[in-house]
Amino acid sequence: MATFSQKPAEVVKKWVLIDAEGLVVGRLASLVANRLRGKHKATFTPHVDDGDNVIIINADKVVLTGKKYTDKKYYWHTGHPGGIKERTARQILEGRFPERVLEKAIERMIPRGPLGRRQMKNLRVNVGPNHQHEAQQPEVLDVAALNRKNKGNA
């Protein structure tokens, strides 16, 4: 039997809805990254965008374990000399765009390159309980029920 290689025209994408309230960031990000890449499917082909469309709601209510809430730092550079900047996870989660903690965690688990950028476009992260994709009839995925460690204590 020959090795199976999926063609882009044969891809069937599902819509998945995940409620992130009370879930641990890293565990959720790992699961979502695998869904976006399509690694949960038997038809996975490394060079084809085979993943599902993922909608995450309540991204501002995620949980960080240990002291990461106060100690984890996010760095970026402005491009100017001496322009290294940093913020803690707490500052970001309490700031204007709290969904970025989850977005960055997922983005950093997906390979960098043209295919990774295309797969990241299949991710929609929302701060509140509402989303604009009711018409796609997303299937609800209960991440907390998959493993007891997925749910945070806080």
Curated annotation (Swiss-Prot):
<keyword id="KW-0689">Ribosomal protein</keyword>
<dbReference type="Pfam" id="PF00572">
    <property type="entry name" value="Ribosomal_L13"/>
</dbReference>
<keyword id="KW-0687">Ribonucleoprotein</keyword>
<dbReference type="GO" id="GO:0022625">
    <property type="term" value="C:cytosolic large ribosomal subunit"/>
</dbReference>
<comment type="similarity">
    <text>Belongs to the universal ribosomal protein uL13 family.</text>
</comment>
<dbReference type="GO" id="GO:0003735">
    <property type="term" value="F:structural constituent of ribosome"/>
</dbReference>
<comment type="function">
    <text>This protein is one of the early assembly proteins of the 50S ribosomal subunit, although it is not seen to bind rRNA by itself. It is important during the early stages of 50S assembly.</text>
</comment>
<protein>
    <recommendedName>
        <fullName>Large ribosomal subunit protein uL13</fullName>
    </recommendedName>
</protein>
<dbReference type="GO" id="GO:0017148">
    <property type="term" value="P:negative regulation of translation"/>
</dbReference>
<dbReference type="GO" id="GO:0006412">
    <property type="term" value="P:translation"/>
</dbReference>
<dbReference type="InterPro" id="IPR005822">
    <property type="entry name" value="Ribosomal_uL13"/>
</dbReference>
<comment type="subunit">
    <text>Part of the 50S ribosomal subunit.</text>
</comment>
<dbReference type="InterPro" id="IPR005823">
    <property type="entry name" value="Ribosomal_uL13_bac-type"/>
</dbReference>
<dbReference type="InterPro" id="IPR036899">
    <property type="entry name" value="Ribosomal_uL13_sf"/>
</dbReference>
<dbReference type="GO" id="GO:0003729">
    <property type="term" value="F:mRNA binding"/>
</dbReference>
